[in-house]
Amino acid sequence: GSGKSFTMMHKDNGIYVLACFDILEYLRVYNGSQGNNSKFLVPVVSFFEIYGGKLFDLLNNRQRLQALEDGKGNVQITGLTEKQISSVDAMLNLIDSGLTLRAVGATGANADSSRSHAILQIALKYTKSGKEYSRISFIDLAGSERASDVQNSDRQTRMEGAEINKSLLALKECIRAMDKSNDSKSGAHIPFRGSKLTMVLRDSFIGNSQTVMIANISPNDKSCDNTLNTLRYADRVKELQHGKGGIIKFNVLKMGQNAADVILGTARDDENDVYKAGIVGVNAAPSQQARVPPASQAPITARQIQQNLPQPHYNPNYNPPNSKPAFEPRVETTDEDDMVRTHCDLVDSIYEQEDLIVRAHRRQVDSMMQLVKEEVALLHAIENDQVSIDDWLVKLSDILSRKEEAITTLKGNLSAFKQALQKEEELSHSIDLNKARKK
């Protein structure tokens, strides 16, 4: 990889460690200057990952989490474990335990590549009330190869790459929308709901917040295109300014400004306004970074970019139903960009179907356990002459019918899921053939 996780997590000079040193030192001075104990602040750490469009708590054995919006539009991570720390070593121990649970895997360029976005949050809370004073988030983005480069990999790696690329494209779309909002009098819709990543990062992009993006690039000639793409990406972020009416405040941290200045200094101006900061690591190669042109150029269309994902379109008024029919990919297309987009959409659909089937399987198991209890009671009754043969036959027939119905329903769901996986395999093969014809 290009060093994203190394930059964020190195135990001596990583961003996590340096920021924690600064924050704890400032807290020591800050709390020492407060005469009232009710104003004392303590640091609280949480650590979770986004994998396959799902959130997992890395401090609680990868328990599933939910990202929900409250009445004020703020994103809340329900069920997230928070641990109070008193030293850098305590934070490193928590991170080490969390990293053992993080999703990693081999790719074409890295034998131990991060396959999830890892988010470490350090929140400052009042000791007496528990109210949050400010928060800083560190996002170590997943490493992902270009879509056309991972097609020869196994299905799991392909699906991981497609989901990662989708979230990075959603992040790029949010940055573009914020740029347009700054230029527009009325403001533009910002599609934060385009992915779980952008939902979680929402607080770091709007309101009383600052964000720094770290662009990691690889020093070799094979990564030249990816390096340029990442630099364009970072340049677009750097050009963002204050939004209209103070709605968007997207500030670039100044050289020499440390994490404690961000999380303590600025927040002190308004103790009633929770201050949030975000630090995002962006890699260049070998990854699929969305190609963002410089601000002075017109947006580049998907067809103008070789081996790059196209621009997604988001409908802010769309409310997803509880379930939806199986996705039908356009396998017959010959345009590689269209095929990659179709593959990305299909993978997204497969992840959603997987969730539905897992829940259906859980319901089927619960139903079977209840039916087994009824069957055992019925068997005990007939053995002890507590029920007539006719009643026993009727009740046993009913139990067997309900078992059969539950199994048939689950098998139908599995059949549809297998078809979606087969279509993913066929589409991946089509992309391989299309790429081979171009060589």
From Swiss-Prot:
<keyword id="KW-0970">Cilium biogenesis/degradation</keyword>
<comment type="subunit">
    <text>Interacts with PLK.</text>
</comment>
<dbReference type="GO" id="GO:0097568">
    <property type="term" value="C:median body"/>
</dbReference>
<dbReference type="GO" id="GO:0097597">
    <property type="term" value="C:ventral disc"/>
</dbReference>
<keyword id="KW-0132">Cell division</keyword>
<protein>
    <recommendedName>
        <fullName>Kinesin-like protein KIN-13</fullName>
    </recommendedName>
</protein>
<dbReference type="GO" id="GO:0051301">
    <property type="term" value="P:cell division"/>
</dbReference>
<dbReference type="GO" id="GO:0005819">
    <property type="term" value="C:spindle"/>
</dbReference>
<feature type="domain" description="Kinesin motor">
    <location>
        <begin position="1"/>
        <end position="240"/>
    </location>
</feature>
<dbReference type="GO" id="GO:0005524">
    <property type="term" value="F:ATP binding"/>
</dbReference>
<comment type="function">
    <text>Involved in cell cycle. Involved in formation of flagella, regulation of flagellar length, and formation of median bodies during interphase. Regulates flagellar length in all eight distal flagellar tips by promoting disassembly of the microtubules. Disassembles microtubules at the distal flagellar tips in a length-dependent manner in order to maintain different equilibrium lengths of the four flagellar pairs. Regulates interphase and mitotic microtubule dynamics. Regulates microtubule disassembly dynamics of the dual mitotic spindles and the median body.</text>
</comment>
<keyword id="KW-0498">Mitosis</keyword>
<dbReference type="GO" id="GO:0097729">
    <property type="term" value="C:9+2 motile cilium"/>
</dbReference>
<dbReference type="InterPro" id="IPR036961">
    <property type="entry name" value="Kinesin_motor_dom_sf"/>
</dbReference>
<dbReference type="GO" id="GO:0036064">
    <property type="term" value="C:ciliary basal body"/>
</dbReference>
<keyword id="KW-0969">Cilium</keyword>
<keyword id="KW-0966">Cell projection</keyword>
<keyword id="KW-0158">Chromosome</keyword>
<dbReference type="InterPro" id="IPR001752">
    <property type="entry name" value="Kinesin_motor_dom"/>
</dbReference>
<keyword id="KW-0597">Phosphoprotein</keyword>
<dbReference type="GO" id="GO:0060404">
    <property type="term" value="P:axonemal microtubule depolymerization"/>
</dbReference>
<keyword id="KW-0282">Flagellum</keyword>
<dbReference type="GO" id="GO:0000278">
    <property type="term" value="P:mitotic cell cycle"/>
</dbReference>
<dbReference type="GO" id="GO:0007018">
    <property type="term" value="P:microtubule-based movement"/>
</dbReference>
<keyword id="KW-0137">Centromere</keyword>
<keyword id="KW-0547">Nucleotide-binding</keyword>
<keyword id="KW-0493">Microtubule</keyword>
<dbReference type="GO" id="GO:0000776">
    <property type="term" value="C:kinetochore"/>
</dbReference>
<keyword id="KW-0963">Cytoplasm</keyword>
<dbReference type="GO" id="GO:0008017">
    <property type="term" value="F:microtubule binding"/>
</dbReference>
<dbReference type="GO" id="GO:0005930">
    <property type="term" value="C:axoneme"/>
</dbReference>
<keyword id="KW-0067">ATP-binding</keyword>
<dbReference type="GO" id="GO:0097542">
    <property type="term" value="C:ciliary tip"/>
</dbReference>
<feature type="binding site">
    <location>
        <begin position="1"/>
        <end position="5"/>
    </location>
    <ligand>
        <name>ATP</name>
    </ligand>
</feature>
<dbReference type="InterPro" id="IPR027417">
    <property type="entry name" value="P-loop_NTPase"/>
</dbReference>
<keyword id="KW-0505">Motor protein</keyword>
<dbReference type="GO" id="GO:1990755">
    <property type="term" value="P:mitotic spindle microtubule depolymerization"/>
</dbReference>
<comment type="similarity">
    <text>Belongs to the TRAFAC class myosin-kinesin ATPase superfamily. Kinesin family. KIN-13 subfamily.</text>
</comment>
<dbReference type="GO" id="GO:0070462">
    <property type="term" value="P:plus-end specific microtubule depolymerization"/>
</dbReference>
<dbReference type="InterPro" id="IPR019821">
    <property type="entry name" value="Kinesin_motor_CS"/>
</dbReference>
<dbReference type="GO" id="GO:1902018">
    <property type="term" value="P:negative regulation of cilium assembly"/>
</dbReference>
<keyword id="KW-0206">Cytoskeleton</keyword>
